[in-house]
UniProtKB/Swiss-Prot annotation:
Name recorded for this polypeptide: Small ribosomal subunit protein uS5
Domain commentary: The N-terminal domain interacts with the head of the 30S subunit; the C-terminal domain interacts with the body and contacts protein S4. The interaction surface between S4 and S5 is involved in control of translational fidelity.
GO BP of this protein: translation
InterPro entries the record matches: Ribosomal_Su5_D2-typ_SF (IPR020568), Ribosomal_uS5 (IPR000851), Ribosomal_uS5_arc (IPR047866), Ribosomal_uS5_C (IPR005324), Ribosomal_uS5_euk/arc (IPR005711), Ribosomal_uS5_N (IPR013810), Ribosomal_uS5_N_CS (IPR018192), Ribsml_uS5_D2-typ_fold_subgr (IPR014721)
Signal peptide: none
UniProt source species: Sulfurisphaera tokodaii (strain DSM 16993 / JCM 10545 / NBRC 100140 / 7) (Sulfolobus tokodaii)
Function, as annotated: With S4 and S12 plays an important role in translational accuracy.
The family this protein is said to belong to: Belongs to the universal ribosomal protein uS5 family.
Length: 214
């Protein structure tokens, strides 16, 4: 179930980095500028200011144990997916003794991992020209899991696994097919492989991009 991502009060934010200072001063006004100039997202508050209407969903909760001199220490490990359902998506993990704190850490981690997703109408079966699917095939890998995402005609829906469906929904993709290999039952690697595939939509340079740069 989607939850609103908590954000800080911009007036109380004291930037610790150059990029944060530029955002605070209003010299950077969008996430698009951040990625176009290859600036790193080193403070979660940057995302709070530039993408304030994010939502997240808890995908997995595990109890992990660590052996210490005092014995075994148990912690919650939380995996979340985050996005604005309009071209930006992320995932994050967090560990803590309390579940609430683990979720907070996962949200912070996800803000640092936010990426842009290029959408389009890349299926030869569809000529609507709307940004409802992917512009081309993209591949991603994490651990033993491999994911190939493919454009689908409008109205097809997301013909993918449940975890991948959530990730694509939060990215704002409505129609897609997928091929997967490996241990897809490991939710974290499955989502990470899908995330890596989506990131490749942005890294791939199309002829249209070359025209824009001239």
């Amino acid at each position: 179930m989607a939850e609103e991502v908590p954000v800080i009060n911009p007036e109380e934010w004291k930037p610790r980095t150059k990029v944060g200072q530029l955002v605070k001063e209003g010299k950077i006004t969008s996430m698009k500028e951040i990625f176009e100039k290859n600036y790193p997202i080193t403070e979660p508050e940057i995302v709070d200011v530039l993408l304030p209407k994010l939502k997240y969903e808890v995908m997995d909760i595990k109890i992990v144990q660590k052996q210490t001199d005092a014995g075994e220490i148990s912690k919650y490990k939380v995996l979340i997916v985050m996005g604005n359902m309009d071209g930006y998506v992320s995932y994050g993990t967090g560990k803590a003794k309390q579940l609430r704190v683990a979720i907070q850490k996962a949200i912070k981690n996800a803000k640092m991992n936010i990426i842009p997703v290029r959408r389009g109408c890349g299926s030869w079966e569809c000529t609507c020209g709307e940004a409802h699917s992917l512009p081309f095939k993209v591949y991603g890998k994490a651990g033993s899991v491999e994911v190939l995402l493919m454009p689908a005609p409008k109205g097809t829906g997301l013909v993918v696994g449940p975890a991948l469906k959530t990730l694509l929904t939060y990215a704002g993709i409505k129609d897609a097919w997928s091929l997967t290999r490996g241990s897809t039952y490991t939710t974290e690697n499955f989502i990470k492989a899908g995330y890596n595939a989506l990131y490749n939509t942005y890294k791939f340079v199309t002829p249209v991009d070359w025209m824009r740069r001239k």
